[in-house]
């Protein structure tokens, strides 16, 4: 039986099964529903603008006032509630938004316009880019010969105080706080007849870079204002690391640290006044860190 005979036999069987009637089979083609898109003017609310200390998502809490009072004491994400076993969509979106802000702060740079506006002396560590800065922290504390000469040529030798600003792990921290904290430090130092000039700005900065700057300048006290690793609470936290006559390889115990400097922590103006007092005490007692009592 050839192919033609096989087709005829199949057609005959189908005709008998349908009572002698043949039907043409047409493949059903799914139709696409037309959805009209309505474009409205306006903007999507910024979810990061919501104050999570005042946001309570728990429905019908037993003690709403007590819950809100507890939330005012901490930036922790309390009272989020859930949809089944999962967090609510709003909570997830806020988490992702805060995480994105933290990432942006790490991988972005301090504006060059700000560096020029503040009349900083720009220098760079041996790190060539952000990737190297994150993977080679040792290079973030060293300067090549050219940068050493730039520091030496633009600073006062053996000054009582050398102020250094470093981008660190948060460029946002520097941009948010530096304009407020520097005048506060300067004003506080006037009470002790102290002053500073020629502020160094270090790109790709790690904290121990201040030790090398201390050796180059011969300053009695070096104060480094640096952006700290951002978290989900804020990307604008800055710290001040201060040391008396810092040297390369010195123990960390010789540094005095003021951390959590930002609008939601220690305000920069308040921190500046405290930094000025610490600098005065270090010069008076000729020590820093755990030796400063």
Swiss-Prot record:
It comes from the Bacteria. Its cofactor is adenosylcob(III)alamin. Its EC number is 4.3.1.7. One of its GO terms (cellular component) is ethanolamine ammonia-lyase complex. Adenosylcob(III)alamin binds at residues 207, 228. Binds between the large and small subunits. It catalyses: ethanolamine = acetaldehyde + NH4(+). Transmembrane segments: none annotated. PANTHER family: ETHANOLAMINE AMMONIA-LYASE LIGHT CHAIN, ETHANOLAMINE AMMONIA-LYASE SMALL SUBUNIT. This is Ethanolamine ammonia-lyase small subunit. It comes from Listeria monocytogenes serovar 1/2a (strain ATCC BAA-679 / EGD-e). The gene is eutC.
């Amino acid at each position: 039986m050839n192919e033609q005979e096989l087709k005829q036999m199949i057609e005959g069987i189908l005709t008998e099964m349908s009572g002698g009637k043949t039907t043409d089979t047409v493949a059903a083609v799914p139709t696409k529903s037309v959805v009209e898109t309505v474009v409205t003017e306006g903007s999507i609310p910024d979810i990061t603008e919501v104050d999570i200390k005042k946001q309570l998502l728990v429905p019908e809490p037993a003690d709403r006032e007590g819950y809100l009072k507890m939330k005012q004491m901490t930036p922790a994400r309390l009272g989020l509630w859930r949809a089944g076993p999962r967090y609510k969509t709003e909570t997830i979106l806020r988490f992702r938004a805060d995480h994105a802000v933290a990432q942006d702060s790490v991988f972005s740079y301090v504006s060059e316009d700000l560096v020029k506006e503040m009349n900083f002396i720009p220098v760079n560590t041996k790190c060539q880019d952000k990737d190297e800065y994150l993977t080679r922290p040792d290079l973030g504390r060293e300067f090549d010969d050219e940068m050493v000469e730039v520091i030496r040529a633009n600073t006062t030798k053996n000054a009582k105080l050398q102020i250094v600003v470093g981008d660190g792990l948060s460029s946002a921290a520097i941009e948010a706080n530096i304009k407020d904290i520097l005048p506060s430090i300067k004003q506080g130092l006037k009470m002790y007849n102290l002053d500073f000039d020629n502020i160094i700005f270090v790109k790709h900065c790690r904290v121990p870079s201040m030790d090398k700057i201390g050796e180059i300048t011969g300053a009695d006290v070096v104060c480094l204002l640096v952006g700290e690793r951002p978290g989900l609470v804020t990307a604008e936290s800055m710290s001040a690391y201060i040391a008396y006559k810092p040297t390369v390889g010195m123990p960390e115990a010789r540094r005095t640290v003021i951390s959590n400097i930002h609008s939601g922590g220690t305000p920069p103006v308040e921190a500046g006044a405290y930094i000025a007092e610490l600098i005065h005490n270090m010069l008076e007692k000729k020590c820093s860190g755990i030796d400063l009592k």
